Design a protein with these regions (language model features):
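Short beta-strand-to-loop elements that line the ligand-binding cleft
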Residues: 106-113, 211-220, 258-261
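N-terminal hydrophobic or amphipathic helices and topogenic motifs
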Residues: 35-117, 299-355
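Short helices/loops that flank or line small-molecule/ion binding pockets
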Residues: 116-130, 143, 177, 221-241
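N-terminal secretory signal peptides that target proteins for export/translocation
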Residues: 1-17
Length: 355
């Protein structure tokens, strides 16, 4: 046989063996880390096996092993994709510029296109701090080691929002039960205002999602709102703060819609850091957030909020967890995989409509 062919086969064999050994080593390391985590953790609660909650505050503890602490030269920040991510990159620019000076690190804004992508980014270590929508915050805590610490707010309280059920102003619908058999847009499977809360609260009002109407996922709150305005949907449950911001920007006219139902108040998006940040960096980051006061353009964008108001997941997200549990929602790995599948299907359906 030709020596060149033999040489090529030998090289190929060596590369294959090396690849197999590498994959085996990675697999064994991951298994060892999981086993180590299980052996060292006395309480995990609802958290993924990668995390521990020994103080029972419902969020991941900082790793005991200092070798696992992260102190990146560049901090990656993002904000929930409730609307166009590019809009929020511009809105947060004064803050990210400040955060860079405050921490002494380069800060970049990472645009995410879905809640699942944002959660995955923190779980994989690519995201260090970010704003998570109200519902997805639960997944971020349990499956990505996110530690919520703030909500937009004022001097005395955090900023909340309501779930609005909106219809066109000239539609015949006057109450929730009138929407049986109609086209109702939900936002995303993980959205509190756009899916979880409606599923938990609507049955008592005479309307059962997926039974009295087929749930149509729009992908984002602005898609639902614009869709109702355009007549693509008969109604949609949306976050009141998004609706008000779109009206304030002139993207919609509030008078073109009617609100036929409004929920109790929920906290708006949480800001959370990765659980494995080096403690000194974490404390610096928290101080930077809490000391910051929003400039005029940010106050306008966020309905008058002027700061990051301190919260805890255990206390301030209790109402969100209660509503989700009332609707049968779980925030575990199986539910998350189902969430990713539904979000991917919703995105594909939306893209197909545009063609």
């Amino acid at each position: 046989m030709n020596k060149a062919i033999l040489s090529f086969q030998n090289v190929t064999t060596m590369l294959t063996v090396t690849l197999i050994n590498t994959l085996l080593a990675v697999t064994l390391m991951a298994a060892a880390q999981a086993a180590y985590a299980q052996a060292e953790c006395t309480n995990r609660g609802d958290l993924d096996v990668l995390y521990c909650d020994e103080n029972k505050d419902l969020v991941a503890d900082t790793p005991k092993d200092a070798k696992r602490h992260k102190n990146p030269s560049t901090l990656v920040f993002t904000y929930t994709p409730v609307e166009d991510p590019a809009v929020y990159e511009n809105i947060f620019k004064p803050f990210t510029d400040y955060l860079g000076k405050c921490t002494g690190k380069r800060v970049v804004f990472y645009q995410v296109q879905s809640n699942a992508a944002e959660i995955e980014a923190m779980r994989s270590g690519r995201l260090h701090v970010g704003g998570f929508s109200t519902g997805p915050t639960n997944y971020a805590v349990n499956l990505a080691g996110a530690v919520p610490f703030a909500v937009k707010g004022g001097e005395k309280e955090w900023q909340g929002y309501n779930v609005y059920m909106i219809v066109k102003k000239d539609s015949p619908y006057q109450k929730i039960a009138d929407l049986k058999g109609k086209k109702v847009a939900h936002v995303q499977p993980s959205s509190n205002s756009g899916n979880l809360a409606p599923r938990a609260l609507f049955p008592a009002l005479g309307l059962i999602p997926d039974q009295d109407y087929k749930v149509l996922y729009s992908g984002k709150h602005d898609n639902s709102i614009m869709g109702v305005g355009a007549g693509d949907y008969d109604a949609a449950p949306v976050a009141s703060d998004v609706f008000k911001r779109m009206a304030a920007r002139g993207q919609i006219k509030a008078e073109d819609f009617r609100i036929i139902w409004s929920s109790e108040t929920f906290p708006t998006s949480s800001f959370a850091y990765a659980h494995d940040l080096e403690p000194k960096l974490r404390d610096t980051l928290l101080k930077c957030f809490y000391d910051y006061r929003f400039p005029a353009e940010m106050r306008k964008a966020f309905d008058g909020a002027d700061r990051f108001y301190p919260i805890t997941y255990q206390k301030d997200w209790a109402i969100v967890r209660k509503v989700a549990e009332g609707g049968g929602e779980k925030f575990n790995s199986a539910a998350y995989e189902n969430l990713k599948k539904k979000e991917a299907e919703a995105l594909a359906a939306k893209q197909a409509q545009k063609k």
